UniProtKB/Swiss-Prot annotation:
ATP binds at R92. It comes from Clostridium symbiosum. The lineage of its organism: Bacteria, Bacillati, Bacillota, Clostridia, Lachnospirales. Residues 499-533 are annotated as: Linker 2. The N-terminal domain contains the ATP/Pi binding site, the central domain the pyrophosphate/phosphate carrier histidine, and the C-terminal domain the pyruvate binding site. Residues 534-874 are annotated as: C-terminal. This is Pyruvate, phosphate dikinase. Phosphorylation of Thr-453 in the dark inactivates the enzyme. Dephosphorylation upon light stimulation reactivates the enzyme.
Amino acid sequence: MAKWVYKFEEGNASMRNLLGGKGCNLAEMTILGMPIPQGFTVTTEACTEYYNSGKQITQEIQDQIFEAITWLEELNGKKFGDTEDPLLVSVRSGARASMPGMMDTILNLGLNDVAVEGFAKKTGNPRFAYDSYRRFIQMYSDVVMEVPKSHFEKIIDAMKEEKGVHFDTDLTADDLKELAEKFKAVYKEAMNGEEFPQEPKDQLMGAVKAVFRSWDNPRAIVYRRMNDIPGDWGTAVNVQTMVFGNKGETSGTGVAFTRNPSTGEKGIYGEYLINAQGEDVVAGVRTPQPITQLENDMPDCYKQFMDLAMKLEKHFRDMQDMEFTIEEGKLYFLQTRNGKRTAPAALQIACDLVDEGMITEEEAVVRIEAKSLDQLLHPTFNPAALKAGEVIGSALPASPGAAAGKVYFTADEAKAAHEKGERVILVRLETSPEDIEGMHAAEGILTVRGGMTSHAAVVARGMGTCCVSGCGEIKINEEAKTFELGGHTFAEGDYISLDGSTGKIYKGDIETQEASVSGSFERIMVWADKFRTLKVRTNADTPEDTLNAVKLGAEGIGLCRTEHMFFEADRIMKIRKMILSDSVEAREEALNELIPFQKGDFKAMYKALEGRPMTVRYLDPPLHEFVPHTEEEQAELAKNMGLTLAEVKAKVDELHEFNPMMGHRGCRLAVTYPEIAKMQTRAVMEAAIEVKEETGIDIVPEIMIPLVGEKKELKFVKDVVVEVAEQVKKEKGSDMQYHIGTMIEIPRAALTADAIAEEAEFFSFGTNDLTQMTFGFSRDDAGKFLDSYYKAKIYESDPFARLDQTGVGQLVEMAVKKGRQTRPGLKCGICGEHGGDPSSVEFCHKVGLNYVSCSPFRVPIARLAAAQAALNNK
């Protein structure tokens, strides 16, 4: 018989895949003798079995759960469902990868109308008993039956107003008893007359099902896609004996970190609430006290807490994020996990742990989440603009960085505005997991309620989004879509600015600037460079991009898109003249006017590179992208060229293609208009030779012919390039070497790579187009249906963001092998967007590519991911 349920004492840290992160850590804490409420874990395999059984919990799993409940009853001397002294439990999810806010918790399970009265008598504290019951009704209704939380919040707010009190804790036992009745009425109405469940066993199975179900709720799917978590992992369920932080003034609950999750600074960091349950701190309903205040409130508990927190950090050798409850002066740990942290904090903590002798340099490099380095490059405010800014309020600096944008009040509105290209600040009373897509779309998040460990703070830090939380002075009018702060009223669409590092809120749109990186970043990067074997280049089209990328550690340019150089105002007219010319001579004349511009750009880039390699891709987009499409611009072009408007319109219409991405572009342009390749070759070679003469820098130009699908195609263009390159060398008296290669971006090129390698001296995989051509859908149109594919679990991630290793990856691997059979030592790289995606970088390492190339600000990510790939695949 399969084992679906494990007591905490039966597990250990090595069982993460089976018990989930929370379950294996609770097991490990049990081994360490920590004060934790005992319980058991229903495994991730049980979750998979639930889905395989048509979303039903099999009888075998149910039997094992109730056997474990019997064991808990014996352990606690209480009965589940007893009317006088009931055993109460909490039910929490726990996937193997931490997913903050994605899964749902239920506390006080086991209470019903009769048990609550016995519970009140047994504890001698009716207020506590009815507070626990109304919380359970609210959580169960929300999590299990999906009755919106807002229904209950409105009732609580109305009662507090009626009683003239500010906080839930000011309500009396009778008030809370009345609340419980009102909550049950809400449940009954929402459930079409069905009463709130009174049988504890039914409550428990409903809760376990809800946790399994929540693995596949929309926000969990979005979070998994954003964080590359496979959908088939499933979640475990942890059932734990309840301990109560809401028993009075000697009880409380809190969340704490062993180091600051925003800065990485060593020292306890966190907050707690007296007379509260765990969800109160995380949900941010009341603004909590800093953890250091606990030393004054409960000195013995504080000392014990500090000792145990340090013990946990030493044991797990990482910064810990701990949840704890104090019940009438007795401390319990509810869970611990490696804490989520900002990228600057991750770097600082990793370096400090190396210095403290807890971990090695290799472990430090592997621990940093490569994607998180994006956060380091988030903007700060321009100091001059900031001086002129008007501070309208301040609150908690929950996630660092600076952001300015238009105010929106709901996640859907924020997402819609972002999709229109607007910069968005999401303003909410408090955020919840349902807001995840709006939070992802926002430049910054501002909340009225909640502390440094609220949902908004934790999720924003994880995403690297600026967040200011707990600004209680804000008055939001959700119906009017306005909020008041600092004597000002802001409507939807008005600009505000947030500083997530100081907690200040500013009126208006304050200019931001790029961030600078810290010493710990440099240390980690030095270690990463020591361990990686894969080179990292950048995709850059301007001298500015090149300098930025070199500063961030790029070892060359893997893709210089020459067409981007033509779109500037003084150049676009010349390329348009070339396109509209009807003879080779006229085209050559127009192109010759472009040579100084292209050459000037190449010279500046070669100088910025200081001898690092640069792969220059020849003109790739279809010509229709360069021609004017408005009548006004067409008339101006006609005037400049001495043509009629009708002639210009006819030429523009002639260039129109039904499927331009698979049309007259790439090397096909050079076959029909060899003069374009001639001009570009002259510009590259003259620039390289002149820079070498001026600076003494050794340069070997790498010329890349795009969109090749046939060896003869490449040979045709290569012959044109060689003829001009040799001519320029002769004119300049130079013996400069150069290489001619191709982009592998058509499946046929990968299939015939052995033949293509007879002509190509290097391969660069253009995985954007290779993905389009292999899947048969375009990057521009896929967004219309990919969401449906995620929901149907056909795809788990966007194939344009994360390389499809099964299909597209197979073509890449095949092309590398075939190419190197023909030309041993063939240099192979990747220059699509995938070059900065960590999982794709690891794939590139495994198949033996020489380098990856990505956008300048993703260079540090690729450097770190390449080191991790080398260390993880030793």
